[in-house]
């Protein structure tokens, strides 16, 4: 990765992000957009929507064009019976950017959105300036057991119960009570965000889309689609990894494994943060993103170099870090439970 002296772009007063819609392949795609300059695409996680970025969107838009979409099946985008795999989501992001006439982008992905961001970089490297992974899914199969259980048939039935009168309010009240009791623990840290996401699930098409999305990436054993076998392909792309130490959805060791598997990547750990570090410390998150944008050159797509890299492959020589981390990465790459796209 090429670093450069920090290039400070002018800060402008800009209008707040506006909610807009485009129809792509017959489906309505919602997104929030603000600012001008180099483009940043913010991709949210499963069950979430573009408003999750509200604390950082407007500030970043003072220096960049910032687009935060609602993924298909989420927020105010349509929720059809469709393909909700990470590859399909990456295709959808490519198509939305094309409709918006945006040729290249720095892609920021949180949770499931991190997996989508990695898949986007894998499928469309010619469109990627930089890659920022925030508590990203798809590093190894490990994921919180709640998601494993929710991927089972009984999980869909449990989500259907949320549509019954008074069930969701009761769950939210119970959650707040539990949150007060465990608020200082890792589990309690992210509970408000979990309750916020639950607000959307009683709507039938939203809960169905959530279930399809979850089952596309998780089963009872954990995450089915992992990125470690292809991380070496980011060799020519500037990569920033951000994670919280109290993340109970995707443990912070995933950050160190991804960092070890991505040559030249940068790593920032938010001490005391949970699964949403950009909520816990938005000012620090903004500073990291801006500094990363300012001190790295956009990736230069070289088809011949990519072809040579693919032929050479990854393996032990491309993994860095401590001995324990390297062993963990290589063991995960060699696992027969891994499924690549």
Curated annotation (Swiss-Prot):
Belongs to the DmpD/TodF/XylF esterase family. It comes from the Bacteria. GO terms for cellular component: plasma membrane. Coiled coil: none annotated. Was identified as a high-confidence drug target. The active site is at 111, 247, 275. This is Uncharacterized protein Rv2715. One of its GO terms (molecular function) is hydrolase activity. InterPro entries: AB_hydrolase_1, AB_hydrolase_fold, AB_hydrolase_sf, Epox_hydrolase-like. Keywords: Hydrolase.
């Amino acid at each position: 990765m090429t670093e450069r002296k920090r290039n400070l772009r002018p800060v402008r007063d800009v209008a707040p992000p506006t909610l807009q819609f485009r129809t792509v392949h017959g489906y309505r795609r919602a997104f929030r957009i603000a600012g001008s300059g180099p483009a940043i695409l913010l991709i949210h996680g499963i069950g979430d929507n573009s408003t999750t970025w509200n604390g950082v969107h407007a500030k970043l838009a003072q220096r960049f064009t910032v687009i935060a979409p609602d993924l298909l099946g989420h927020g105010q985008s349509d929720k059809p019976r469709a393909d909700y795999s990470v590859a399909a989501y990456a295709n959808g992001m490519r198509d939305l950017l094309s409709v918006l006439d945006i040729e290249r982008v720095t892609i920021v992905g949180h949770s499931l959105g991190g997996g989508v961001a990695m898949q986007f970089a894998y499928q469309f490297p010619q469109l990627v300036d930089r890659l920022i992974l925030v508590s990203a899914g798809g590093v190894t199969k490990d994921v919180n057991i709640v998601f494993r259980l929710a991927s089972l048939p009984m999980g869909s039935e449990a989500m259907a119960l949320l549509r019954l009168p008074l069930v969701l309010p009761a769950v939210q009240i119970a959650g707040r009570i539990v949150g007060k009791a465990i608020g200082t623990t890792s589990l309690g840290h992210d509970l408000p965000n979990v309750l916020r996401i639950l607000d959307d699930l009683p709507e039938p098409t939203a809960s169905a889309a959530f279930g399809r999305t979850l089952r596309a990436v998780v089963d009872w054993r954990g995450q089915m689609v992992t990125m470690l076998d292809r991380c070496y392909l980011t060799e020519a792309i500037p990569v920033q990894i951000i994670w919280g130490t109290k993340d109970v959805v995707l443990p912070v060791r995933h950050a160190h494994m991804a960092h070890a598997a991505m040559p030249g990547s940068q790593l920032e750990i938010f001490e005391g943060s949970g699964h949403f570090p950009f909520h816990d410390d938005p000012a620090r998150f903004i500073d990291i993103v801006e500094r990363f944008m300012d001190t790295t050159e956009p990736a230069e797509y070289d088809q011949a170099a990519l072809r040579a890299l693919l032929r050479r492959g990854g393996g032990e020589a491309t993994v860095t870090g401590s001995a324990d981390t390297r062993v963990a990465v290589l063991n995960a790459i060699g696992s027969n439970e891994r499924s690549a796209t």
